[in-house]
Amino acid sequence: MPETTQETCAPAKDSPFFIKNLLNCDSKPSKPRPVLAATKAALEGGFSLSQVGEFNFPRFELPAQRFSLPAHYLERTSAWWYPYTLSSGAHLHRTEVTERPGARDSSPTSGTDRDSPDLVLKTEPDAKEDEDDDEHNNNKSSDEIILEESDAEETKKEELEEWKKRDEDKKPCRKKKTRTVFSRSQVFQLESTFDMKRYLSSSERAGLAASLHLTETQVKIWFQNRRNKWKRQLAAELEAANLSHAAAQRIVRVPILYHENSASEGGAAAANVPVSQPLLTFPHPSVYYSHPIVTSVPLLRPV
């Protein structure tokens, strides 16, 4: 405590807190050293220990008694106060760290390389190839879809054809009827026998078939068709007769009211038989007038 009081009471000239004492600046200005070489070397290969030594940095000294620190520790304040004056290992470590991002920048994905026209020209064909591949894949996909649809349609058609074939197999096969053509002589003889007999026995049918050089089935079928035709003709004739009879019944018969013979006979009978005189009636009941009616004699009118 007494030591500190003595120091505070000391004159201001001996105070260690002056700027002059802190910076330890000399009264005479030192000659400026060439800094261009050091800056060039720093830009080219980074800072080195020898180049840093050329710079004149002021030392910041503090009194040992003020902070109760040893003097040999404070002498090295310039080393830990300025980080770039540390050991060579730290300097090398920093240069390695700074070199790594440079290597990254030198990679082909740097901004300058990206902006180069060669890479742009290279990337354009790649993009075109990618687009061509996409179009090719799209075309393939559409073709595959079309093929799948066509395959599905073909399978459906095949299934329908199989079903149709099965249905045809199930249905009984109907053979087309063979139509026999008869000659005029055969038709005439068949018609004449049909006029005589509508139905033939088995023996008659066999004899007729032998005479006409036909089979019994052909003769049998011809007679069946002829009988059907004959029945249709009879039905048509009956319908025509019924229609005519119905039309005759629809005619209204009007009775005859006057005959000439009956009128002459009636006139002669009237001449022989006296005709009764009718009475002329009037609305008044008490007055009656009798007047004879003369039919044959005309009335005489005065001139």
UniProtKB/Swiss-Prot annotation:
Domain of life where this protein originates: Eukaryota
DNA-binding region: 175-234
Localization in the cell: Nucleus
Alphabetized CDD domains for the sequence: homeodomain (cd00086)
GO molecular function: DNA-binding transcription factor activity, RNA polymerase II-specific; RNA polymerase II cis-regulatory region sequence-specific DNA binding
UniProt keyword DNA-binding, yes or no: yes
This protein's UniProt keywords: Developmental protein, Differentiation, DNA-binding, Homeobox, Neurogenesis, Nucleus, Transcription, Transcription regulation
Reported tissue expression: Expressed in the ear placode and vesicle and in cells forming the vestibulo-acoustic ganglion.
Family, similarity comment: Belongs to the HMX homeobox family.
Entry-linked PANTHER family: HOMEOBOX PROTEIN HMX (PTHR46110), HOMEOBOX PROTEIN HMX3 (PTHR46110:SF2)
Protein name per Swiss-Prot or TrEMBL: Homeobox protein HMX3-A
Originating organism: Oryzias latipes
